[in-house]
């Protein structure tokens, strides 16, 4: 009997336990993604509910265009829409709806100045993934905007600096009357005074805008900053949905996005492989794989990276690079870092740091994407 018990114990340890451990690991991963019927704690249930309310807005084509002058092939944009749709991403920002007549850059790709007929030729059949475009104050011709029922676009986002919020809200009112979902994205928040923000919120609260964005234009915010900003927005704009647009200068875009998400921010901006101006954005593939929403699938996003983003990354540069880190730490626009990376001295980081921290350094010019 003793020998039989010993043999049974050996068999259990050698064969049965490893199988249970593998199954446990698999179930743990499934539970994290909300794919099993296991019993969840109250905290997990609350988090799952929040995750199900989140919406990912992928801005690869729009923000990534700042890297390659919007030189995306029709095939890539079609693949992006199909892939993001398969991945369960709720919105794809397909470019800017600015006017070439009001802005230099006629040599830019078509996603810089979206044309409705062209967009309908590229994306012939829409899916559940909605399409958005972004406009800048003073750069959009309102006559170019069709009523929503005549457009492929579902959402128009208005980017503005704090001084132009009144002009942004005029556009929001018009786009809202056309039937579009709308957002207002207040840029360079890390340079905005408290009283300016409070005054702007009074007008925003009375407007029909659907979503108000916390935008970390310079990639200078940390988790405490995001927590503070989101709380302020929630307190002063209780009836508005909130969004987050983070930059990755200090390797915090994903972490900061999760901070906002945990506080109930609904719209989360991201881009495939993090493609975006300078240090780039929160990677779509991270959000899709992390959020506990069974609608999200990581495989189609990995396919997009493999087929399109890897080859593109060999031609143009974005992501965490020291000059952009320095700009983020100093709460400065990355334009100086972008100029450095385009020069023969692109890796002279100490000289760059000394230049930006010298008393003669010019203050940040706010007018920029």
Predicted regions and their residues:
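Aromatic (phenylalanine/tyrosine) cluster motif
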Residues: 12-15
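Intrinsically disordered, low-complexity segments enriched in serine/threonine/proline/glycine
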Residues: 38-39, 43
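Catalytic cores and adjacent flexible loops of soluble metabolic enzymes
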Residues: 44-369
């Amino acid at each position: 009997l003793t020998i039989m018990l010993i043999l049974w114990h050996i068999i259990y340890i050698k064969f049965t336990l490893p199988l249970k451990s593998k199954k446990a690991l698999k179930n743990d991963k499934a539970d994290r993604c909300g794919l099993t019927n296991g019993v969840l704690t109250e905290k997990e249930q609350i988090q799952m509910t929040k995750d199900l309310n989140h919406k990912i807005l992928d801005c690869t084509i729009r923000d990534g265009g700042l890297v390659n002058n919007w030189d995306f092939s029709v095939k890539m944009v079609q693949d992006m829409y199909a892939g993001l749709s398969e991945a369960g991403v709720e919105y794809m920002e397909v470019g800017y709806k600015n006017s070439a007549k009001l802005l230099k850059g006629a040599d830019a790709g078509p996603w810089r100045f979206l044309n409705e007929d062209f967009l309908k030729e590229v994306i012939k059949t829409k899916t559940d993934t909605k399409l958005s475009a972004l406009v800048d104050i003073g750069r959009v011709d309102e006559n170019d905007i069709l009523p929503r029922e005549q457009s492929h676009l579902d959402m128009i986002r208005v980017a503005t600096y704090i001084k132009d919020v009144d002009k942004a809200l005029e556009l929001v009112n018009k786009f809202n009357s056309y039937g579009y979902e709308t957002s207002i994205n207040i840029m360079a928040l890390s340079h905005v005074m408290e009283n300016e923000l409070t005054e702007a919120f009074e007008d925003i609260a009375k407007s029909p805008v659907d979503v108000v964005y916390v935008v970390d234009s310079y990639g200078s915010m940390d988790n405490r900053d995001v927590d503070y900003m989101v709380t302020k927005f929630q307190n002063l704009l209780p009836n508005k949905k909130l969004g987050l647009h983070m930059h990755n200068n200090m390797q915090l875009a994903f972490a900061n996005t999760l901070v906002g998400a945990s506080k109930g921010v609904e719209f989360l901006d991201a881009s495939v492989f993090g493609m975006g101006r300078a240090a780039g954005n929160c990677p779509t593939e991270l959000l899709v794989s992390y959020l506990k929403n069974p609608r999200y699938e990581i495989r189609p996003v990995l396919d997009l990276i493999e087929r399109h983003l890897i080859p593109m990354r060999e031609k143009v540069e974005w992501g965490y690079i020291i000059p952009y880190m320095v700009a983020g730490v100093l709460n400065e626009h990355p334009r100086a870092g972008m100029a450095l990376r385009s020069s023969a001295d692109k890796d002279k980081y100490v000289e760059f740091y000394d230049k930006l921290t010298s008393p003669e350094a010019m203050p940040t010019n706010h007018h920029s994407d």
